[in-house]
Amino acid sequence: MNFCKAFSLLKILTLLVLAGILSACGGSDGFPPTVTGVKVQSAQYGKTATIYIGGKDLRTSVVVETNGSCTNPTFASSSTTDLLVLSCQARVVGDFPLVVKSAEGAVIYTSTLTVPKPQVTLITANGGFSLELNQALAPITVDNFLSYVAKGYYSNTLFHRVIPGFVAQGGGYTSGMVKKAGQLAPIVLESNNGLSNIRASVAMARTNVANSATSEFFINLVDNLSLDYKNSGSPGYAVFGSVVQGMALVDAMAQQPTGVINGFADVPLNEILISMVLQTQ
């Protein structure tokens, strides 16, 4: 064998050995992924959260687990080997685990993420006030209310029933006491949840039928313990949150003169219009 042939054979053998090493490691993706940090943007209950996972040699073949707390996970096309961008829908309130695993199932990173209690802000001509919603104790009611908020249903509805020393009720009528269309199906009554109709609490209005609440809600201007759950024969009204900012504005509603309009009593003569309701947390 001459020198040139021997050199060529050595070169081929070297390439084969290198190829074998790369193949054993998984090719260019052979280095194990590492995570150096996680950042969450827009972690609001019921909305899409964006999770940024930074590190090295990351691939969309890694597995991100949230114990069902953030559903429908999807990696963005903008993800790189140094930064994975994951979107998912936050379905719990409070702390939940985030675990990143390699494609082979090895845990490479763990963390705890937090979704705060949802808050919404109601805007009227006289200013705004904020509600904090208790998803843990009234999950069906909170999801229902946020569904109306998300589709903009409450825009241009009225606080149509205001009784000093009792309640301010809204969310079902437009100017001139016209019933607003587009309500969702009635929900199951969640009044036996440990929450009470105390001052500044917010509850769902309903008919005499227990499971009849749709869009209308009321704010308790005083402690109305008579509206609490007593038993199945006296189920009360489901509290699902409270006013956490701007209660003075709600109290001012009760100072407005009221009368009978289109057969409805206790209607503010100067309309109290809700221009919009936004989820702010």
Predicted region positions:
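Sec-dependent bacterial lipoprotein signal peptides
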Residues: M1-S23
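Cyclophilin-like peptidyl-prolyl cis-trans isomerases
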Residues: C25-Q281
